[in-house]
Regions:
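Bacterial N-terminal signal peptides that target proteins for export
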Residues: 2-12
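C-terminal motif of bacterial Sec signal peptides marking the signal peptidase cleavage site
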Residues: 20-23
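Bacterial lipoprotein signal-peptidase II cleavage site
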Residues: 25-31
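Post-signal peptide N-terminal segment of mature Sec-exported envelope proteins
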Residues: 31-53, 71, 76-77
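Single conserved position on a long alpha-helix in the C-terminal lobe of the eukaryotic protein kinase
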Residues: 41, 66-166, 305-399
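Hydrophobic lipid-interacting interfaces of membrane-associated proteins
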Residues: 137-142, 173-189, 228-230, 269-271, ...
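Leucine-rich, highly hydrophobic segment in Treponema pallidum outer-membrane-associated proteins
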Residues: 158-263, 403-449
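Long, K/E/R/D-enriched contiguous segments that form extended
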Residues: 260-341
Length: 449
């Protein structure tokens, strides 16, 4: 009996070792992703295999699927200098070489165990029998440097790769078929602002991260995400701030029009929420102009309920911002006459009876009350205020329904975002193959209890 027990134990140990070795082999191509990556997305290979639209958007087309092992995950990543990358497991390097010879702009060359190519003078490609790497877009002059970077990545050991980073461990723990973990600095600035809410003053976007699971159904991409930090002190402050956000009632869920780029929804007590806004540098930059004309901080203190910020433009000079908020006891209305008298030269505040307009040169901003709703927006007359609450072309109901009951949500108008050049050159560029034909993106913030 003892001998049999020893034999079973030996078999068990052998099986464990075999599983560990198999696990290492499964991840060996992932070590090509650099440890310095600021964002990493994992896409289940089955998702790619089932969609001919994902790989067809790559610079060398969907034929590359014949040479890849789509039983393994495909990874997209952003390098520290802002380039986008892709990493995939190679199944047939000979077939991959044939495909690259037809797709490459110049001749595929060999460097040791690696093959190097460029596509359209802007994408660097490197591969061996194990991994395929793509990096770009870069200028034609920068292609040699990009290819040298690919060789270093293909050569690097696990300690120099993303596998050694907590970012990868976090990514690996997300159960969605499409998942990502990113430093907030990898996001466009305006989209990054909500994820920085609650971060301590002095913390920058490289110290705060986002973990997200992605699902697409009926043309809507839903992203369930959480902001956090690998630095305990920063993470603690982020977690503390989450209690300020209350379940959204849905008062303004139908107020976003299809002409707007994105909108942020929450439910707050303004007195508690104001310190978070004041510590968020990106949002403060947007709101600073208002504070020079009116006492926006005092307006915010009157907020108690649902609040929504929507943006139709992205430049600092023209954010095209609209704000709607449920208010209680807005005592600041008694100060409007003082604001009128205190305007700087060249500026003015006009209006009465709950509707006022601030003007400075060619720019204008209207604000006021519609019942117990505060509104503030660029260039709206009193007769047009109703269109803010009931736009003629609101976002689809199946999109707006996802907002209600959450504690913070963002809705992104995909066509408008792509049209404004926001779906390339940053982490949002990673989503481009997946958001193809998606009508809207709903990003819901989840918080630890």
């Amino acid at each position: 009996m003892k001998t049999r027990f020893i034999d079973l134990k030996a078999v068990w140990l052998i099986m464990v070792c075999a599983l560990c070795l198999a696990s290492c082999r499964n991840n060996d191509y992932v070590r090509s992703i650099p440890a310095s990556a600021t964002a990493v997305m994992r896409i289940d290979g089955a998702v790619v295999a089932q969609s001919d639209k994902v790989l067809s958007l790559l610079p060398f087309g969907d034929k590359v699927a014949e040479a890849l092992d789509l039983s393994r995950d495909i990874y997209a990543f952003e390098t520290i200098d802002g380039n986008l990358g892709m990493c995939a497991k190679v199944k047939d390097s000979d077939r991959l070489l044939e495909i690259m010879k037809k797709a490459a702009t110049s001749e595929v060359r060999r460097q040791g165990d690696y093959r190097l190519a460029d596509i359209n003078n802007s994408w660097a490609v490197g591969f061996d029998d194990n991994a395929l790497l793509v990096l770009g877009p870069v200028s034609a002059a920068a292609l040699p440097d990009a290819q040298r970077s690919l060789v270093r990545m293909l050569k690097q050991d696990e300690d120099a790769s993303i596998l050694a980073r907590p970012m990868y461990s976090r990514l690996d723990s997300i159960g969605s078929r499409v998942a990502l973990v990113a430093q907030v600095q990898a996001l466009p600035e305006k989209l990054a602002a909500p994820f920085m809410l609650g971060a301590p003053k002095g913390a920058d976007a490289s110290q705060v991260a986002v973990a997200a699971g992605v699902d697409v159904k009926d043309g809507i991409m839903r992203i369930d995400c959480e902001n956090f930090s690998f630095q305990k002190s920063v993470d603690r402050e982020l977690h503390k701030s989450h209690s300020v956000l209350r379940p959204i009632k849905g008062d303004f869920k139908n107020c976003m029009s299809q002409s707007q780029l994105f909108a942020l929804f929450a439910n707050v007590n303004g007195k508690d929420f104001l310190p978070l806004l004041q510590s968020d540098r990106s949002l403060q930059a947007v709101l600073m102009g208002l504070n020079t004309a009116v006492d926006f901080d005092n307006i915010m203190r009157s907020v108690d309920g649902d609040i929504a910020f929507a943006f139709s433009g992205m430049s600092p000079d023209n954010p095209g911002m609209t704000m709607l908020a449920r208010v209680d006891n807005p005592v600041w209305t008694a100060d409007v006459d003082y604001w009128k008298q205190s305007c700087q030269p060249g500026c003015s505040i006009t209006g009465s009876d709950g509707h006022w307009t601030y003007r400075s040169g060619d720019t204008g901003f209207s604000f006021g009350l519609q019942g117990d709703v505060f509104y503030g927006t660029s260039g709206v007359s009193p007769a047009q205020v109703q269109h803010l609450l009931k736009p003629a072309n609101p976002i689809p109901a199946d999109v707006s329904r996802m907002i209600q009951g959450e504690r913070m949500a963002m809705v992104l108008n995909v066509k408008a975002l792509v049209g404004n050049g926001m779906a390339a050159g940053s982490m949002s560029g990673m989503l481009k193959p997946i958001i193809n034909n998606v009508k809207a993106v709903v990003c819901v913030m989840k918080f630890k209890k």
